[in-house]
A protein has these predicted regions:
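A solvent-exposed, acidic/Ser-Thr-rich amphipathic alpha-helical stretch
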Residues: 4-5, 23-76
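Hydrophobic pocket/interface hotspot
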Residues: 14, 26-27, 34, 47, ...
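Short, surface-exposed coil-to-beta transition loops
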Residues: 66-67, 95-101
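Short beta-strand segments enriched in hydrophobic/aromatic residues
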Residues: 30, 85-87, 101, 118
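A short hydrophobic beta-strand element
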Residues: 76-85
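Short, cysteine-centered beta-strand-loop-beta hairpins and adjacent loop/turn segments enriched
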Residues: 87-96
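Short, low-complexity N-terminal intrinsically disordered segments enriched in polar/charged residues
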Residues: 1-32, 127-129
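Short beta-strand edge/turn micro-motifs at domain boundaries
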Residues: 98, 102-125
Length: 129
């Protein structure tokens, strides 16, 4: 792995892409054969077409998608993000639940794998509220 990668900077660009709510901006930071998995909700999603659809569905499922960062831990070729997903259904109050991302990158700094873990009790409560 190249020592020249600034993982914190890559993580910041990746977060900004998610906050833009633009699946294509997110995909621009992914390797072509990258994998995404929302553990407990989906199996592995692989490839640009499937990832674009999955990311678009995230924004449909969680209107006004937002992120509150609690911790960002970086390594040579990965980061771990402890965060809260916020969203606001039409005409309702903001809701939220905790999540944890483990994101791996290649030598070019492109995301090769993103695993997201949720507190499923919080997700269920947020969706039911």
């Amino acid at each position: 792995m190249s020592k020249s990668l600034n993982i914190a900077e890559i993580a910041g660009r990746y977060a900004a892409a998610w906050l833009s709510h633009d699946p294509d901006a997110i995909l621009a930071l992914h390797a072509p054969d990258s994998i995404f998995q929302a553990h407990g909700r989906t199996g592995e999603v692989k490839g640009n077409t499937a990832l674009r659809q999955e990311f678009a569905q995230v924004f449909e499922r969680y209107p006004d998608f937002g992120v509150v960062t609690h911790r960002l831990l970086v390594g040579d070729n990965h980061w771990t993000l402890d965060w809260t997903l916020t969203f606001r259904p039409s005409g309702k109050d903001q809701r939220s639940f905790r999540a944890l991302d483990v994101v791996e990158v290649d030598a070019k700094g492109l995301v090769t794998r993103k695993d997201t873990f949720f507190d499923h009790a919080q997700v269920k409560a947020a969706l039911a509220a």
